[in-house]
Amino acid sequence: MIKMRVRFPTLVLLLGIVFLMAVSIGIAYGEKNVIKNHERPQEREQEERDPRQQPRPHHQEEQEREHRREEERDREPSRGRSESEESREEEREQRREPRREREQEQQPQHGRREEEEEWQPRRQRPQSRREEREQEQGSSSSSRRQSGYERREEREQEQEQGSRSDSRRQRNPYYFSSERFQTLYRNRNGQIRVLERFDQRTDRLENLQNYRIVEFQSKPNTLILPKHSDADYILVVLNGSATITIVNPDKRQSYNLENGDALRLPAGTTSYILNPDDNQNLRVVKLAIPINNPGNFYDFYPSSSKDQQSYFSGFSRNTLEATFNTRYEEIQRILLGNEDEQEDDEQRHGQEQSHQDEGVIVRVSKEQVQELRKYAQSSSRKGKPSKSGPFNLRSNKPIYSNKFGNFYEITPNRNPQAQDLDISLTFIEINEGALLLPHYNSKAIFVVLVDEGEGNYELVGIRDQQRQQDEQEVRRYSARLSEGDIFVIPAGHPISINASSNLRLLGFGINADENQRNFLAGSEDNVIRQLDTEVKGLTFPGSTEDVERLIKNQQQSYFANAQPQQQQQREREGRRGRRGHISSILSTLY
């Protein structure tokens, strides 16, 4: 009994101790869960704020765990934890450790996943605030890119519309505006310009790579200094009058040239051109055929100026002294020029400007003009061109003529000067409101310059000649024409020219020997009209009678009224309007 009494208090004491331990364990475990539950939202919020944050070092996590253990020991009412509790805590930490490692392994891959999702459709999953912001930024950037594409498309459309309004000049390889000329020399007395190469913009004009167009203009009482060139020239005066002097080793010849006069100037021939008029400017156009290098030619001047050097300056001192049997200083002073001596001469002559300061186009006095024109010959106004002298493009009757225009032509077989060059010259006059009927040249390529007036032309070609024959597409090349413009008519390409004002055209025909001009409409020289009647019915969709009636409907040849049907329609509408006005007045009276 006594033993039972002793054991009972002991049992109660043990139960009390166990109860206290359980209570302490429960309190500690509850506090730990509260701390852990309080820390996890912060960790998730930190991960959402910066998902690419690098994992914390392992020793830092160990320090934090040890610090938490010490805090938990301080909170316990008992003397400390039992070994079983510590072991359970370590087991819980070990269970949490693999989860952290998995999270750490997933964090470096998050950036790659976002990069992949930029190029792939996003998955249907909940998004954080940061992801939503990124998606909004991505959508805004894509919208900006899309708006940029739209702006670029709008600019391209505007450029395309601008090119259309500009007569498709940029897409027309056969048209060259006057702005395509490049200035070689320019001063206050005039200028010399050259057109860009024909084959520079398209390989369709490859056969014209050895032909260039040169134009020079000079004011009254001026002289273009002597020079020679490594190119053959065919020269035509378009405005004013000129006196040209051609110098050969054994003689010198001078010719007076008027508007429409032409002259062959062989390569290597020294020449100089004078504008003798007191009031009118001189304008000359030349077709250049280079000798040494296709498409390139050079002018060689014996004198030096601010625009070019004398070809004598290219020789050595010893060569010049031996050539002229004179000291070099004297040669330099007389031929090449000395800057110091030029300044002294200017001071002695009252600062008067020297010819070397003016350039290649200089002013001359009236006395010098009279002396230069003393022995000049005039051009031939009648008959065939001579072998050496100038000739006029309108010296003979036009080959095509009616009340709407005139067509002059000098073929190689009628022009001894251009026969070896295989060049023909044409001069076309189209009256205002008239049309040069559609036609094509059998083998000649024509380079046409607008001398005066305005109009437009339509040239028919093939869009892509590299395709097969059954895939070729007809294309119309058109442009507005004004003074100074140039266009090319390839062989076999039909063309028509419409004059909105009195139009004057100068043409150089290349490969012109035995060329034949074939008109596609009109009462004469019409190749369509020469087709057999049965062939006409088989060629066109209309009946044979309709085709015959349509072809014969045009009574004019070569030139015609540009808008006959429109004018008749306007006249009929005007008469109909007047009758309607009178009938309305009568109806009000009665």
UniProtKB/Swiss-Prot annotation:
The keyword Kinase does not apply. It holds the Pfam family Cupin_1. The keyword Signal applies. Residues 174-332, 391-548 form the Cupin type-1 domain. Residues 137-146 have a biased composition (Low complexity). One of its GO terms (molecular function) is nutrient reservoir activity. Residues 1-30 form the signal peptide. Seed storage protein. Accumulates during seed development and is hydrolyzed after germination to provide a carbon and nitrogen source for the developing seedling. Component of globulins complexes which accumulate in seeds. The variability of the residues taking part of IgE-binding epitopes might be responsible of the difference in cross-reactivity among legumes. This is Conglutin beta 4. It comes from Lupinus angustifolius.
